[in-house]
């Protein structure tokens, strides 16, 4: 509940922690605050993904991030290996829209001047891919393996 609201940009982290604490026994309040304050710490880079992103960029492809995330994404993102290769980012909290709603994909296209049929969307959620495809952007469901993704991208004509 709180996470979805933070991703939509309709709740701050402080409000989320307070909301969680209102439903938890006092002995768990500190853990609720830690969860909200440190959500990004256990996230580890996918092996091979930074290299793949760099190769895409070197090959001349545009690389963009469309993420369902809270405002904290702006702090976290620069620490992600390969993030420097991205041409643009669109964070759900900033635009008050979340995947899989079609409007967020349309906003991605208009913000960065993208043509959906010339893009390839990669996401770990099948409903997000299906929604992107309904707006004209083909996609691949990412299962956590960069080498597998590279092979799947070749089927779409991506050369890396």
Question: Model regions: which residues?
Answer:
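Conserved phosphate-coupling serine/threonine residues in phosphotransfer and NTP-handling enzymes
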Residues: 67
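A metal-dependent, Asp-based hydrolase signature
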Residues: 3-35
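Short, acidic loop-to-helix structural element flanking the phosphoryl-transfer center
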Residues: 14, 28-64, 102, 147
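Residues at alpha-helix boundaries and short interhelical turns
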Residues: 7-10, 43, 47, 116
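Residue-level recognition of short, well-ordered coil/turn positions
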Residues: 10-11, 61, 113
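Short histidine/acidic/glycine/proline-rich micro-motifs that form metal-
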Residues: 2, 38-42, 95
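Asp-based, Mg2+/Mn2+-dependent phosphohydrolase catalytic module
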Residues: 54, 70-160
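Positions in alpha-helical segments
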Residues: 1-4, 51
